Amino acid sequence: MESEKIIEERLKALRSTIALHDFHYYVQDAPIIPDADYDKLFRTLQQLEQQYPHLITPDSPTQRVGAPPLKVFARLTHQTPMLSLTNAFTEDEAIAFDKRIREALNVDQVNYAVEPKFDGLAVSLVYTNGILTNGATRGDGYTGEDITLNLRTIPSIPLRLQTATVTDQFEVRGEVVMLKADFEHLNEQQRNKGEKLFANPRNAAAGSLRQLDSNITAARKLTFFAYDAVLSHKDQPFFSKHSEILDYLKSQQFLVAQQNGTTTGVAGLLTYYHEMGALRLSLPYEIDGVVYKVDNLTQQETLGYVSRAPRFAIAHKFPAQEASTELLTIEIQVGRTGALTPVARLAPVFVGGVTVTNATLHNEDEVQRKQIMIGDTVIVRRAGDVIPEVVAVIPEQRPAHAQPFIMPDHCPVCGSKAARLPGEAVTRCTGGLYCPAQRKQAIWHFASRRALDIDGLGEKLIDQLIDRELVHTPADLYKLNIDTLASLERMAEKSARNLVTAIEHSKKTTLPRFIYALGIRHVGEATAKALANQASHLDQLMTLDIEQLQQIPDVGPIVAQSIIDFFSEAHNREVIRQLLDSGLQWEIPNHGVQQSEQTNSAVSGKTFVLTGTLPTMTRDQAKIKIEQQGGKVTGSVSSATSYVVAGSDPGSKYAKAIGLGISVLDEDQLLSLLQNISTGAQQ
């Protein structure tokens, strides 16, 4: 049996090894062993400590786990006050700060330490004989809340210092934040549980850190960044600069911002400010400015303090990304695809460096989830070039006259019915062929290659036609003449003549192409073909009810409802009538003959996926040949796929087909199959 001294040495070695791996994983973001090996080490430590509970030490990694809930936080007095920094909001104020420093020190230039200003919760960590013993919030700067148990759950906070300090007590200061990715993950969890979402990472970090139950804190991912240490007179001879303190903290396995640095003079300060402003959105954590500190510690002592802030440091703040203002009303904006988006009209507020009067509310569900009412005081966020959005309501400031928002059931632009399909968050205008807001998208789709295929009618030309009010619906394309088109930018008479010819040629089409060209939501090429096969006359298709539509291949309840909504809208029916009056026509296929041919084809009823580059024909040409013989072409490989036709550079679809055991054909094999008019063709 092992002696207790040997067990104690094993425990010490395990704790040291696990602490090293925690540092590599949580601080350096570069693990050096697999998770399974780490878990094995941790379980071994747990088992030994269960056998020898009297050998458990406060710095053991097992002691990070949550403790029983507290009833209230105790108060802790800071031995050295945690003072806040004076803020600078303009470059002039930063220039004035540098001038005061130079004059007070009687020097021409000053060396500064520069750091990002974290937007989190400032805390203090006290190490006694190298072991973390106390942790507290800033509080009022003199007294904070004892959150030691919660801080111990944060993996990036060392429970033991790597080397001994000169004094028995060593105090580290820094910021607890929630990384942006962890914030998104937490809010996703909150959303799935039907619980309130956090407005921003700072609120999430503060709320998580100030939990009376440290198990809740342990379950949320928090990160600690060290940015200073409180030096005693015994420590001071070992450091001459603030930047040296940060280097020491890194050596003790604290996480220190990579963007820290040093610079000289006010020009260096302002360069750093602008560099960090440009980096701000790409950083993994939120910052609300930068911090300038005189780097020389002797100079810091000379400058001293004023009131509740040091003279030797200042926070240069970025323009606020969040601000509160009154929500005056909610209007509906209709997008180019018919989406109805609620937009908040706001009392003007300066946020993110600009004056904001409008902010997106995304959709009806978001308005309800955030419990937004007209007349509320709301928090508006604008980060960089991101569209301003309302992130939260301040319910305590809700006036008695506040009104709930009701999503309209008709499009505010064209008056068509507005519908929201099952499972979708967006309400949409059903007047796709008529609605002015959807005009450009509707006409571009109508003329696209897979629809009516009007050669020469590109987006820029469509923009001109609509902006000059020459075209309002797709039917107006057939009223255009050479003289009108020749008057447009970059349209000579020859180009105009060619376009008129292309428009005229588009009148002879097929029913599947025409159905697809209408732009019915969720109706792609395959569904358009299925609809045309079921109802060879357009009038017949327009009168099918939802049950009849769902009998058609590829048409489920959502697609069926979308078709019903489209053809129920009088504006759409009028545009279709105008198109037919313009001379659009297609041959009525003889389904009996076609079915007979398809029945005898080895391709009939089979599902194909095309991938890669074929030697002698395009994938579109191959698709047409397959469909002519009753086959179906889809875009993804599944167990329902009959064949994958692979050319050169086939990609992942080929690999998936092999994995599922699906037959893979080359072009020659496909052509052979197409020529094999036999019901007994092998798969």
Curated annotation (Swiss-Prot):
Disulfide bonds: none annotated. GO terms for biological process: DNA repair; DNA replication. CDD domains: BRCT_DNA_ligase_like, LIGANc. SMART domains: BRCT, HhH1, LIGANc. The active site is at K117 (n6-amp-lysine intermediate). Its cofactor is Mg(2+); Mn(2+). GO terms for molecular function: DNA binding; DNA ligase (NAD+) activity; metal ion binding. Zn(2+) binds at C411, C414, C429, C435. It catalyses: NAD(+) + (deoxyribonucleotide)n-3'-hydroxyl + 5'-phospho-(deoxyribonucleotide)m = (deoxyribonucleotide)n+m + AMP + beta-nicotinamide D-nucleotide. Its EC number is 6.5.1.2. NCBIfam families: dnlj (TIGR00575), PRK07956.1 (NF005932). This is DNA ligase. It comes from Nitrosomonas eutropha (strain DSM 101675 / C91 / Nm57). The lineage of its organism: Bacteria, Pseudomonadati, Pseudomonadota, Betaproteobacteria, Nitrosomonadales.
